[in-house]
Swiss-Prot record:
Protein name: Chaperone protein HtpG
Signal sequence, start to end: none
Complexes and interactors: Homodimer.
Location in or out of the cell: Cytoplasm
GO biological process, one term: response to heat
PROSITE patterns: HSP90
Organism of this sequence: Mycobacterium tuberculosis (strain ATCC 25618 / H37Rv)
Segments of this protein annotated with the region B: 354-567
Keyword Cytoplasm set for record: yes
């Protein structure tokens, strides 16, 4: 007996996505069937694993399969599985709402998408393929019963902002999705999805490799023979159940037997993507540890790339039997964008994540896969620079995380990394290219860290470097602040921050040693006085060799923590001791020479005014590097007073 039918509203984000689907402008509406079959395959995988691990679950897993049922008269198409099924709350959570992070970002990106293809890619990235049913259907019905439970749930919607849900009895285990198809419309790319030929074609194109049988009842018409019915005899109609897919594990087939299109469709299945991969990696290892792997480097970064709880994307099989998805032990975290499958030969079928953490074979496979992925990226870098630039734009930030965690592959990672520099506004540079361009006598690789390229180019710290033609790497990702402190050198060249430690770019052509010593004596009194006056803010005041235009700048000790790095640590909840920095002065700047003269000629009542000038000098140095003033109101007050005196 059916329970009361409840009508509910879709979550706001879901309503907007439904509207996109119902009034779809997407060119590839055929992909809805791939999404439904992929969901059914996932449900079968989950049931098999659950039955293996939960001995109390009484289910029959001897004939797990997917069925497709097309009814031409009713214009319906049903995709049915006998997999894990869903409970009522799961239906509401997974379909009635979008219980995912990033929905606001998805809406924004969809609005900005330039064309249908871009929108399709975004929908795929956000993992909401079920909604694609509304591209071809006026109404969608879902019936599901979770394995081990008696009650089932029926869900129905026309995609107009509401849906109905009710509890039912006597439903088979698993899930069936029935689409009430829209009329055929060639102009809108709506085909006859009840056509046996069309269904066969789509399954072959998108889902031939699915590990579970995809079955469909088909009619077979046999003309009556002369002996049986003569000319007036009727043809015989029989119904046969056929398996539409080959179920061949793509990774187990020789590479020369697999077409590029088959690889692409398999990628879309395992990655839940709508676009093509940037690179395909097929490998087979024999010997102590035997395994096969089929990996993909995506073309676009997923929206949750920097979500630590996001899925890794590597599926683990043992002898072609699915064991688990998102096996994070098979790939380091900084390669979490890699998708694909690994099929091991010598491993228990009931392996758990806890066992995997200690498994020697898994660790060996992980090392080999990591090296293979990195070497593939290096090959792309050298042979297909445009594809490499695409890759680096999408995944460079996350790849640099490996410079912190993967010491064994650090040199390789440094080699395949690219950085913006002062050499070119448009083309990033590798460290090897930087080293090739180093000036005669240059021993260090110079870099600057900050929030944006524009901010760094205007930084006082770069003035002398630009004036003398030294190239400086401009590092603007938060991870850059961390890894530069852990990577001492590249190709024997130390990495040197332009804002840390002592940097002397002067030469005998600029000033002699005697001239520098004389200048130091001239400013000695001012430096001592400034250090006392600004002792609450700085640990030292000294003359600079890195300034040519600005009056002053703030730097950090060679092994000190930059303000940006301190902010990163504080944001992560770590205690960071407050450290004072060093104030460097440009001895050639009129403000500094004027301050020296004023300090030298000061009267007794001028001390306060000079101290305020020193405070303003410190504040301008802080602002020039993009820092935040400790007391903005006081700075504004002092500045207003000085400006008033000039009028």
């Amino acid at each position: 007996m059916n329970a009361h039918v409840e009508q509910l509203e879709f979550q706001a984000e879901a309503r907007q996505l439904l509207d996109l689907m119902v009034h779809s402008v997407y060119s590839n509406k055929d992909a809805f069937l791939r999404e439904l079959i992929s969901n059914a395959s996932d449900a079968l995988d989950k049931l098999r694993i659950e039955a293996l691990r939960n001995k109390d679950l009484e289910v029959d897993t001897s004939d797990l399969h997917i069925e497709i049922d097309a009814d031409k008269a009713a214009r319906t198409l049903t995709v049915r599985d006998n997999g894990i099924g869903m409970a009522r709350e799961e239906v509401v959570d997974l379909i009635g709402t979008l219980a995912k992070s990033g929905t606001a970002e998805l809406r924004a990106q969809l609005r900005e998408a330039k064309n249908a293809a871009a929108s399709e890619e975004l929908i795929g990235q956000f993992g909401i393929g079920f909604y694609s049913s509304f591209m071809v259907a006026d109404k969608v019905q879902l019936l599901t019963r979770k394995a081990g439970e008696s009650a089932a749930t029926r869900w129905e919607s026309s995609g107009e902002g509401t849906y109905t849900i009710e509890s039912v009895e006597d439903a088979p285990q698993g899930t069936s999705v029935t689409l009430h198809l829209k009329p055929e419309d060639a102009e809108d790319d709506l085909h006859d999805y009840t056509s046996e030929w069309k269904i066969r074609n789509l399954v072959k194109k998108y889902s031939d490799f699915i590990a579970w049988p995809i079955r469909m009842d088909v009619e077979r018409r046999t003309p009556a023979s002369q002996e049986e019915g003569g000319e007036g005899g009727e043809e015989t109609v029989t119904i046969e159940t056929e398996t539409l897919n080959s179920m061949k594990a793509l990774w187990a087939r020789p590479k020369e037997e697999v077409s590029e299109q088959e690889y692409k469709e398999f990628y879309k299945h395992v990655a839940h993507a709508w676009d093509d991969p940037l690179e395909i990696i097929a490998m087979k290892a024999e010997g102590t540890f035997e395994y096969q792997a089929l990996l993909f480097i995506p073309s676009h970064a997923p929206f949750d790339l920097f979500d630590r709880d996001a899925h890794v994307g590597i599926q683990l099989y043992v002898k072609r039997v699915f064991i688990m998805g998102d096996c994070d032990q098979l790939m380091p975290e900084y390669l979490r964008f890699v998708k694909g499958v690994v099929d091991a030969q010598d491993m228990s079928l009931n392996v758990s994540r806890e066992i995997l953490q200690q498994d020697r074979q898994i660790k060996a496979i992980r090392r080999r896969l990591t090296k293979k992925v990195l070497s593939t990226i290096k090959d792309v870098q050298s042979s297909r620079p445009e594809d490499y630039r695409t890759f680096w734009t999408q995944f460079g930030r996350v790849l640099k995380e490996g410079l912190l965690s993967d010491i064994d592959n650090r040199e390789t990672l440094l080699g395949i990394s690219s950085f913006v520099s002062t050499y070119s506004e448009e083309e990033p540079t590798t460290l090897a290219e930087y080293v090739e361009r180093m000036k005669d006598g240059q021993q260090q690789i110079f870099y600057a860290t900050g929030e944006t390229r524009q901010q760094l180019l205007k930084s006082p710290h770069l003035e002398a470097f630009k004036a003398k033609g030294y190239e400086v790497l401009l590092l603007t990702d938060p991870v850059d602040e961390v890894w530069v402190g852990m990577v001492p050198e590249f190709d024997g060249k130390p990495l040197q921050s332009v804002a840390k430690g002592e940097v002397d770019l002067s030469s005998e052509e600029d000033t002699s040693e005697a001239e520098r010593e004389e200048r130091q004596k001239e400013f000695a009194d001012l430096l001592t006085w400034l250090q006392e006056t600004l002792s609450d803010h700085v640990k030292e005041v000294r003359l600079s060799t890195r300034l040519t235009e600005s009056p002053a700048c703030l730097i950090t000790d060679a092994f000190g923590m930059t303000p940006a790095l301190a902010r990163i640590y504080r944001a992560s909840g770590q205690e960071v001791p407050v450290g004072k920095r060093i104030l460097e002065l440009n001895p050639s700047h009129p403000l500094v020479t004027g301050l020296r003269q004023a300090h030298q000629d000061r009267a007794d009542d001028a001390e306060k005014s000079l101290a305020e000038t020193a405070e303003l000098l410190y504040g301008t140095a802080l602002l020039a590097e993009g820092g935040a003033l400790e007391d903005p109101a006081r700075f504004a007050e002092l500045l207003a007073e000085r400006l008033a005196r000039t009028l």
